[in-house]
C-alpha cells in the first residue's frame, strides 16, 4: 500500500473494510488477489504497511482478504478457532501496532461457527472433546455461551447470539490483557471493534447488536 493510501485514522480504516465488503457481497473485485511473480517481488521489496489487524475464526469459509477485498500487505490476519485471545496473538497485535502504526483491530466472529456449536453441545453433555486442548478452548468460550443457553436455549439464532457475545468478550479480553493496546486506544491511535460475518450473505456487520439477532426470526 502506498503511504498516500494509508488510512489517517481508525475510521478511515473501517471505511475501507466496509467498502471492500460491499464489493465482495456484490461479486465485484478491485484487488489482484493472485499477483504475478514481478508484483510479488515488488511487494517483498517495498515491505508491508498493514492498516488493519483482523482476529478471526479458523473456519475455512472466512478468508478475510477475500471477504474485505483486500490485497497482500493490507491486512494482518490472525486466525484461531473461536477467535479467542492468547498471549501469542496479543504479542502479534502489539508488534503490528507498534511497528506499523496500524490504527484498527477487528475481532471477527461468524454464523454457523463449529466451535460455538461444540461448546453448546458440550454444555448439554452431547459432545466430548477429543483432547485436553479442545476442552481448554471450549472452556474459554463457555462464559459467552452459558448465559444465552440458559436464557435463549430454544432461540433459532442461539449460535449467532453466542458467537457475537464471544466476539465482545474477546475485545474486552484484549483491552484487559494488553497495556500497550489499551494505552493506544486511550490515546485515540487505535480502535478495537467487533464484527460478525454472515456465511449466508457474505455481509459483515460491524458492532453487531444482540437485540437485533434476538428479534430476528
Labelled PLM ranges:
Residues 1-47, 72-73, 82-102, 114-217:
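Divalent-metal-activated hydrolytic enzyme cores
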Residues 28-29, 63-68:
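Short, glycine/acidic-enriched capping/hinge loops at junctions between secondary-structure elements
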Residues 35-40, 56-60, 64:
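Long, hydrophobic/aromatic N-terminal blocks
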Residues 55, 79, 196:
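Residues in well-ordered beta-strands of folded domains
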Residues 56-61, 81-84, 110-113:
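Short glycine-enriched loops at secondary-structure junctions
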Residues 69-77:
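Short helix-loop-beta junction
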Residues 107:
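Conserved functional hotspot residues or short segments at active or partner-binding sites
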